[in-house]
Amino acid sequence: MRRLPAVAGSFYESDPKKLKMQIEWSFRHNIGPRDIPKQSYEKKKRDNLFFIVPHAGYIYSGPVAAHSYYYLASEGKPDVVIILGPNHTGLGSYVSAWPKGEWETPLGSVKVDEEVLMQLVMESEVIDLEEKSHLYEHSIEVQLPFLQYFFDDNFKIVPIVIMMQTPEIAEFLADAIYKVIQKYSDKDIVVLASSDMNHYDPHEITMKKDEEAIEKIQQLDYRGLYEVVEGKDVTLCGYGPIMVSLILAKKLGKKAYILKHATSGDTSGPKDSVVGYLAARFGS
Protein backbone atom coordinates (compact mmCIF):
# COMPACT_ATOMS: atom_id res chain seq x y z
CA MET A 1 0.00 0.00 0.00
CA ARG A 2 1.54 3.28 -1.14
CA ARG A 3 0.51 6.77 -0.17
CA LEU A 4 1.44 9.02 -3.09
CA PRO A 5 2.45 12.67 -2.54
CA ALA A 6 -0.48 15.08 -2.65
CA VAL A 7 1.32 18.44 -2.48
CA ALA A 8 4.64 17.89 -4.29
CA GLY A 9 5.02 20.72 -6.78
CA SER A 10 2.90 23.09 -4.70
CA PHE A 11 4.01 23.02 -1.06
CA TYR A 12 7.51 21.91 -2.01
CA GLU A 13 9.51 21.18 -5.16
CA SER A 14 8.65 18.00 -7.05
CA ASP A 15 12.11 17.63 -8.59
CA PRO A 16 14.46 15.81 -6.14
CA LYS A 17 17.47 18.06 -6.79
CA LYS A 18 15.42 21.24 -6.48
CA LEU A 19 13.75 19.87 -3.35
CA LYS A 20 17.10 19.25 -1.67
CA MET A 21 18.16 22.77 -2.62
CA GLN A 22 14.91 24.11 -1.15
CA ILE A 23 15.58 22.29 2.13
CA GLU A 24 19.14 23.66 2.23
CA TRP A 25 17.75 27.14 1.51
CA SER A 26 15.45 26.72 4.53
CA PHE A 27 18.39 25.97 6.82
CA ARG A 28 20.56 28.81 5.48
CA HIS A 29 17.80 31.43 5.45
CA ASN A 30 18.26 34.35 7.86
CA ILE A 31 15.06 33.24 9.64
CA GLY A 32 16.40 29.66 9.75
CA PRO A 33 19.30 28.27 11.81
CA ARG A 34 21.76 29.52 9.12
CA ASP A 35 23.59 26.20 9.15
CA ILE A 36 22.96 22.59 8.14
CA PRO A 37 23.76 19.81 10.63
CA LYS A 38 25.90 16.98 9.35
CA GLN A 39 24.10 13.88 8.13
CA SER A 40 24.69 11.06 10.59
CA TYR A 41 23.23 7.60 11.24
CA GLU A 42 25.21 7.39 14.47
CA LYS A 43 23.23 6.38 17.54
CA LYS A 44 23.33 9.09 20.18
CA LYS A 45 21.54 9.56 23.46
CA ARG A 46 18.51 11.60 22.51
CA ASP A 47 17.37 14.35 24.85
CA ASN A 48 14.77 16.04 22.65
CA LEU A 49 11.94 13.54 22.15
CA PHE A 50 9.16 15.82 20.93
CA PHE A 51 9.09 18.72 18.48
CA ILE A 52 6.62 21.27 17.14
CA VAL A 53 7.02 21.86 13.39
CA PRO A 54 5.00 24.02 10.97
CA HIS A 55 3.51 22.56 7.80
CA ALA A 56 3.00 25.33 5.24
CA GLY A 57 4.71 25.65 1.88
CA TYR A 58 8.46 25.54 2.30
CA ILE A 59 8.94 29.09 0.98
CA TYR A 60 6.83 30.29 3.92
CA SER A 61 7.52 27.96 6.85
CA GLY A 62 10.61 26.01 5.78
CA PRO A 63 13.11 28.28 7.58
CA VAL A 64 11.17 27.97 10.85
CA ALA A 65 10.75 24.19 10.49
CA ALA A 66 14.51 23.91 9.92
CA HIS A 67 15.14 24.93 13.54
CA SER A 68 13.37 21.83 14.86
CA TYR A 69 15.01 19.57 12.29
CA TYR A 70 18.41 21.00 13.17
CA TYR A 71 18.05 19.67 16.72
CA LEU A 72 16.46 16.41 15.61
CA ALA A 73 19.20 15.64 13.07
CA SER A 74 22.00 16.73 15.43
CA GLU A 75 21.04 13.94 17.82
CA GLY A 76 21.31 11.24 15.16
CA LYS A 77 18.90 9.01 13.28
CA PRO A 78 15.66 8.03 15.02
CA ASP A 79 14.22 4.55 14.50
CA VAL A 80 10.60 5.69 14.43
CA VAL A 81 9.00 9.10 13.93
CA ILE A 82 5.39 9.38 15.10
CA ILE A 83 3.96 12.32 13.15
CA LEU A 84 0.77 13.89 14.48
CA GLY A 85 -1.03 16.31 12.19
CA PRO A 86 -4.41 18.03 12.10
CA ASN A 87 -7.03 16.98 9.58
CA HIS A 88 -7.61 19.94 7.25
CA THR A 89 -9.80 18.10 4.73
CA GLY A 90 -12.62 16.90 6.99
CA LEU A 91 -12.39 13.45 5.41
CA GLY A 92 -12.28 10.19 7.34
CA SER A 93 -12.26 9.40 11.05
CA TYR A 94 -11.88 11.57 14.14
CA VAL A 95 -8.39 10.09 14.69
CA SER A 96 -6.84 8.15 11.85
CA ALA A 97 -3.60 6.24 11.32
CA TRP A 98 -2.40 5.15 7.89
CA PRO A 99 -2.44 1.36 8.31
CA LYS A 100 0.59 -0.03 6.45
CA GLY A 101 2.94 0.20 3.50
CA GLU A 102 4.97 3.22 2.44
CA TRP A 103 4.70 6.96 1.91
CA GLU A 104 6.32 8.35 -1.21
CA THR A 105 7.89 11.75 -1.82
CA PRO A 106 10.23 12.95 -4.59
CA LEU A 107 13.11 11.83 -2.32
CA GLY A 108 11.95 8.20 -2.11
CA SER A 109 9.75 6.05 0.11
CA VAL A 110 9.44 5.73 3.88
CA LYS A 111 7.93 2.64 5.48
CA VAL A 112 5.23 2.66 8.13
CA ASP A 113 6.30 0.89 11.32
CA GLU A 114 3.37 -1.49 11.46
CA GLU A 115 4.45 -3.13 14.73
CA VAL A 116 4.63 0.15 16.64
CA LEU A 117 1.44 1.34 14.96
CA MET A 118 -0.56 -1.74 15.92
CA GLN A 119 0.66 -1.52 19.51
CA LEU A 120 -0.41 2.11 19.56
CA VAL A 121 -3.86 1.17 18.26
CA MET A 122 -4.15 -1.54 20.93
CA GLU A 123 -3.21 0.92 23.69
CA SER A 124 -5.54 3.62 22.40
CA GLU A 125 -9.33 3.78 22.41
CA VAL A 126 -9.57 6.38 19.66
CA ILE A 127 -7.36 5.51 16.65
CA ASP A 128 -8.95 4.11 13.50
CA LEU A 129 -6.93 2.49 10.72
CA GLU A 130 -7.98 4.02 7.41
CA GLU A 131 -6.59 5.84 4.39
CA LYS A 132 -9.24 8.41 3.48
CA SER A 133 -8.12 10.97 6.08
CA HIS A 134 -4.59 10.96 4.67
CA LEU A 135 -5.05 11.01 0.89
CA TYR A 136 -5.08 14.80 0.44
CA GLU A 137 -3.79 15.93 3.84
CA HIS A 138 -0.51 17.87 3.77
CA SER A 139 0.38 18.27 7.46
CA ILE A 140 2.28 14.97 7.66
CA GLU A 141 3.55 14.77 4.09
CA VAL A 142 5.52 18.02 4.23
CA GLN A 143 7.61 16.71 7.14
CA LEU A 144 8.95 13.72 5.24
CA PRO A 145 11.42 15.40 2.84
CA PHE A 146 13.18 17.10 5.77
CA LEU A 147 13.59 13.70 7.45
CA GLN A 148 14.62 12.00 4.21
CA TYR A 149 17.22 14.68 3.51
CA PHE A 150 19.13 13.54 6.60
CA PHE A 151 18.18 9.88 6.99
CA ASP A 152 17.15 8.66 3.50
CA ASP A 153 14.83 5.68 4.05
CA ASN A 154 16.60 4.46 7.20
CA PHE A 155 13.75 5.27 9.56
CA LYS A 156 10.06 4.41 9.82
CA ILE A 157 6.99 6.51 10.47
CA VAL A 158 3.64 6.28 12.24
CA PRO A 159 1.35 8.85 10.54
CA ILE A 160 -1.69 10.00 12.55
CA VAL A 161 -4.12 12.79 11.68
CA ILE A 162 -6.48 14.26 14.26
CA MET A 163 -9.83 15.79 13.37
CA MET A 164 -11.35 15.77 16.88
CA GLN A 165 -8.93 18.10 18.69
CA THR A 166 -10.12 18.01 22.29
CA PRO A 167 -8.18 17.68 25.55
CA GLU A 168 -9.80 14.29 26.12
CA ILE A 169 -8.63 12.92 22.75
CA ALA A 170 -5.17 14.36 23.43
CA GLU A 171 -5.08 12.55 26.79
CA PHE A 172 -6.01 9.22 25.18
CA LEU A 173 -3.35 9.61 22.49
CA ALA A 174 -0.63 10.82 24.84
CA ASP A 175 -1.26 7.93 27.22
CA ALA A 176 -1.06 5.42 24.36
CA ILE A 177 2.14 6.95 22.94
CA TYR A 178 3.69 7.03 26.41
CA LYS A 179 2.99 3.30 26.87
CA VAL A 180 4.46 2.55 23.44
CA ILE A 181 7.62 4.55 24.21
CA GLN A 182 8.01 2.55 27.43
CA LYS A 183 7.35 -0.79 25.74
CA TYR A 184 9.80 -0.11 22.91
CA SER A 185 12.52 1.42 25.05
CA ASP A 186 15.09 -0.18 22.73
CA LYS A 187 13.79 1.96 19.86
CA ASP A 188 14.63 5.63 19.38
CA ILE A 189 11.14 7.12 19.00
CA VAL A 190 10.56 10.81 18.21
CA VAL A 191 7.18 12.57 18.08
CA LEU A 192 6.47 15.50 15.75
CA ALA A 193 3.48 17.77 16.38
CA SER A 194 2.68 19.37 13.03
CA SER A 195 0.95 22.73 13.36
CA ASP A 196 0.86 26.26 12.05
CA MET A 197 -0.04 29.11 14.39
CA ASN A 198 -2.56 31.95 13.95
CA HIS A 199 -3.94 32.49 10.44
CA TYR A 200 -4.66 35.54 8.26
CA ASP A 201 -4.41 38.46 10.66
CA PRO A 202 -1.82 41.24 10.21
CA HIS A 203 1.70 40.40 11.38
CA GLU A 204 1.56 42.29 14.68
CA ILE A 205 -1.80 40.80 15.68
CA THR A 206 -0.68 37.29 14.75
CA MET A 207 2.51 37.61 16.81
CA LYS A 208 0.48 38.80 19.80
CA LYS A 209 -2.11 36.03 19.49
CA ASP A 210 0.62 33.44 19.03
CA GLU A 211 2.39 34.62 22.18
CA GLU A 212 -0.70 33.76 24.23
CA ALA A 213 -0.56 30.20 22.90
CA ILE A 214 3.23 30.01 23.27
CA GLU A 215 2.95 30.98 26.94
CA LYS A 216 0.73 27.93 27.53
CA ILE A 217 3.11 25.73 25.54
CA GLN A 218 6.04 26.84 27.70
CA GLN A 219 3.99 26.02 30.80
CA LEU A 220 3.03 22.58 29.37
CA ASP A 221 -0.55 23.67 30.04
CA TYR A 222 -2.52 21.74 27.44
CA ARG A 223 -5.93 22.72 28.78
CA GLY A 224 -4.84 26.34 28.92
CA LEU A 225 -3.76 26.09 25.28
CA TYR A 226 -7.16 24.68 24.36
CA GLU A 227 -8.88 27.56 26.16
CA VAL A 228 -6.73 30.12 24.32
CA VAL A 229 -7.56 28.57 20.95
CA GLU A 230 -11.26 28.18 21.66
CA GLY A 231 -11.84 31.35 23.65
CA LYS A 232 -9.54 33.98 22.15
CA ASP A 233 -9.89 33.39 18.42
CA VAL A 234 -6.33 32.09 18.01
CA THR A 235 -6.64 30.08 14.79
CA LEU A 236 -3.95 27.51 15.55
CA CYS A 237 -4.72 24.55 13.29
CA GLY A 238 -2.78 21.74 15.01
CA TYR A 239 -3.53 22.36 18.66
CA GLY A 240 -4.50 18.69 19.07
CA PRO A 241 -1.01 17.40 18.16
CA ILE A 242 0.57 20.11 20.32
CA MET A 243 -1.61 19.15 23.31
CA VAL A 244 -0.43 15.55 22.94
CA SER A 245 3.19 16.73 23.04
CA LEU A 246 2.59 18.86 26.13
CA ILE A 247 1.07 15.93 28.01
CA LEU A 248 3.91 13.63 26.95
CA ALA A 249 6.54 16.19 27.92
CA LYS A 250 5.07 16.47 31.41
CA LYS A 251 4.88 12.67 31.78
CA LEU A 252 8.54 12.30 30.82
CA GLY A 253 9.89 15.29 32.71
CA LYS A 254 10.75 17.40 29.66
CA LYS A 255 10.63 21.18 29.31
CA ALA A 256 9.52 23.28 26.34
CA TYR A 257 12.14 25.34 24.52
CA ILE A 258 11.06 27.81 21.85
CA LEU A 259 13.48 27.69 18.92
CA LYS A 260 11.85 30.15 16.52
CA HIS A 261 8.63 32.09 16.16
CA ALA A 262 7.97 34.00 12.94
CA THR A 263 5.30 34.59 10.32
CA SER A 264 4.98 34.25 6.58
CA GLY A 265 5.54 38.01 6.49
CA ASP A 266 9.06 37.44 7.84
CA THR A 267 9.97 34.80 5.27
CA SER A 268 8.46 35.62 1.91
CA GLY A 269 5.25 37.60 1.94
CA PRO A 270 3.44 40.84 2.82
CA LYS A 271 2.59 41.50 6.45
CA ASP A 272 -1.04 42.55 6.13
CA SER A 273 -2.31 38.95 6.24
CA VAL A 274 0.05 36.30 7.58
CA VAL A 275 0.29 32.84 9.12
CA GLY A 276 2.34 32.27 12.26
CA TYR A 277 4.93 29.49 12.54
CA LEU A 278 6.58 27.96 15.59
CA ALA A 279 9.52 25.61 16.06
CA ALA A 280 9.95 24.12 19.52
CA ARG A 281 11.67 21.21 21.19
CA PHE A 282 10.94 19.35 24.40
CA GLY A 283 14.03 18.22 26.29
CA SER A 284 15.89 18.47 29.59
UniProtKB/Swiss-Prot annotation:
| InterPro entries reported in the protein's UniProt record | MEMO1_fam
Q: Could you tell me which Pfam families the record lists for this protein?
A: Memo
Cross-referenced Gene3D superfamilies? LigB-like
The similarity annotation says: Belongs to the MEMO1 family.
Q: Which NCBIfam families match?
A: AmmeMemoSam_B
PANTHER family for this protein: PROTEIN MEMO1
Entry protein name: MEMO1 family protein SSO0066
The species is: Saccharolobus solfataricus (strain ATCC 35092 / DSM 1617 / JCM 11322 / P2) (Sulfolobus solfataricus)
